[in-house]
Amino acid sequence: MEQSEEGQQQQQQGVMDYVPPHAYQSGPVNAASHMAFQQAHHFHHHHQQQQQQQLQMFWANQMQEIEHTTDFKNHTLPLARIKKIMKADEDVRMISAEAPVIFAKACEMFILELTLRAWIHTEENKRRTLQKNDIAAAISRTDVFDFLVDIIPRDELKEEGLGVTKGTIPSVVGSPPYYYLQQQGMMQHWPQEQHPDES
């Protein structure tokens, strides 16, 4: 009886201790694969930094454009349509003249950022045409676009390796903040993960 138990333990231990013959190879093969991994990691990190710089430049340009805007009569989006959408809410009785202007600019900035993030995905896939799955990828990778996840068709998320969720994508330190507080003529920024009410 003891021999059969010992035999089973040895078999189990043998299965658990099995290591493929090439797992601990040293020399050129292992060094080459390690070097390739390091290069791929370095490229990925560098690519992420470039994307982050693009987004930071985008927001810096948007802030500068807002600060220097003097013509509030020309808009890229139709104010009448925005006002009509605002009035779709039954609780809204009256709308000031400034409200649609602010909504127009906010919508423009929303579209521009989503387009930039989708274009980044397009370039990652070495294409020159932005597709709807690029927009789906931009939405699924960005926390502030979570409210749009339910309107993305599920098949769009499966195309071109979009099974990667934002949980598996490393966050880049210094991502553009989305919470602003105007105080004494200065702009304060909080990181995307931290809200001013949480400090």
Swiss-Prot record:
The keyword Iron does not apply. One of its GO terms (molecular function) is protein heterodimerization activity. CDD domains: HFD_NFYC-like (cd22908). GO terms for biological process: positive regulation of DNA-templated transcription; regulation of DNA-templated transcription. Keywords: Activator, Cytoplasm, DNA-binding, Nucleus, Transcription, Transcription regulation. GO terms for cellular component: CCAAT-binding factor complex; cytoplasm; nucleus. It comes from Arabidopsis thaliana (Mouse-ear cress). The keyword Glycosyltransferase does not apply. It is found in: Nucleus; Cytoplasm. Its main location: nucleus. Pfam families: Histone. Ubiquitous. SUPFAM superfamilies: Histone-fold. This is Nuclear transcription factor Y subunit C-2. Heterotrimeric transcription factor composed of three components, NF-YA, NF-YB and NF-YC. NF-YB and NF-YC must interact and dimerize for NF-YA association and DNA binding. Interacts with HTT1 in both cytoplasm and nucleus. Stimulates the transcription of various genes by recognizing and binding to a CCAAT motif in promoters.
